[in-house]
C-alpha cells in the first residue's frame, strides 16, 4: 500500500495592499514612513583624492554589532559595471554621525588573458567590479565578518553576476576596528588558489 500526501509550498511574505510604487522615481512617489530619518553618511566628490572621489556608490548593507553600526557599500568611479570596483566601510555609534569611509575590499586585478566561456573580450590591464548581495555575517562565537564578491565585466554588455566572476571574499572586523586578512571564501569555476593574486592586507 502506498500513501501519498499532498505537499504544500511554504507561505511567503507578499504584499496585499493597493498602493503601488512608481518606478520612474527613485523614491517611488511613496509617502515616507512616520518616524523614519534619511541620514547621509558621506558625500561623493570627484574633486576629492580619497575614498569619496568615486561617484557611483550603492548597495548599502547595514549591521549592528558590539554597540556599533557598520555600513558596507560598493563603489566604482562612474558606473555600476565600469571597473575598477571596491567596497568601503563606515561606522557609527548612534546612526547619525559616521566615520570617514575606509576601503575594506580593494580593487582587484583580473589576470591578463582571461576570457569568459563563449565570449571574445579578453582581459588586459582589467580590474574586477564588486557585486555582492550579502555584506556581513555574525558567527555563533560573536565574531563579525565582512563579505564581498569580485565579478568581471569585460565589455559594455557583460554581466558581473553571470557565474564567471572571480569569487567571494571574506575578512574579519575586529572589536578594536582593525581588519583581518582577506580570504577567498568561494571561487567561481575558472579560479582557484593557484591563479588568483594574494589580496592586500589593509
Model-derived features with residue positions:
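Short glycine/acidic-enriched loop and turn motifs that connect beta-strands
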Residues: 76-80, 151-156
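Blade-loop segments of beta-propeller domains
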Residues: 78-144
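Beta-propeller domains
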Residues: 17-45, 72-106
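Beta-propeller fold detector
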Residues: 99-106, 180-190
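Beta-propeller blade signature
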Residues: 86-94, 160-176
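Bacterial Sec-dependent N-terminal signal peptides
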Residues: 1-10
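Entry beta-strands of beta-propeller and related beta-repeat scaffolds
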Residues: 68-72, 142-146
Amino acid at each position: 500500500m502506498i500513501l501519498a500526501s499532498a505537499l504544500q509550498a511554504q507561505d511567503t511574505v507578499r504584499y496585499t495592499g493597493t498602493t503601488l510604487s512608481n518606478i520612474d522615481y527613485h523614491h517611488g512617489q511613496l509617502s515616507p514612513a512616520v518616524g523614519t530619518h534619511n541620514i547621509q553618511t558621506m558625500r561623493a566628490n570627484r574633486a576629492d583624492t580619497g575614498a569619496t572621489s568615486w561617484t557611483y556608490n550603492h548597495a548599502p548593507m547595514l549591521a549592528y554589532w558590539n554597540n556599533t553600526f557598520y555600513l558596507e557599500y560598493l563603489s566604482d568611479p562612474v558606473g555600476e559595471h565600469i571597473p575598477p570596483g571596491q567596497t568601503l566601510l563606515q561606522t557609527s555609534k548612534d546612526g547619525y554621525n559616521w566615520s570617514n569611509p575606509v576601503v575594506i575590499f580593494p580593487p582587484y586585478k583580473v589576470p591578463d588573458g582571461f576570457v569568459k566561456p563563449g565570449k571574445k573580450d579578453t582581459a588586459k590591464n582589467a580590474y574586477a567590479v564588486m557585486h555582492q548581495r550579502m555584506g556581513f555575517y555574525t558567527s555563533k562565537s560573536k565574531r563579525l565578518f565582512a563579505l564581498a564578491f569580485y565579478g568581471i565585466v569585460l565589455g559594455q554588455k557583460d554581466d558581473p553576476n553571470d557565474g564567471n566572476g572571480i569569487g567571494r571574499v571574506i575578512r574579519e572586523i575586529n572589536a578594536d576596528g582593525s581588519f583581518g586578512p582577506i580570504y577567498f571564501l568561494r571561487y567561481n569555476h575558472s579560479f582557484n588558489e593557484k591563479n588568483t593574486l594574494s589580496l592586500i592586507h589593509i
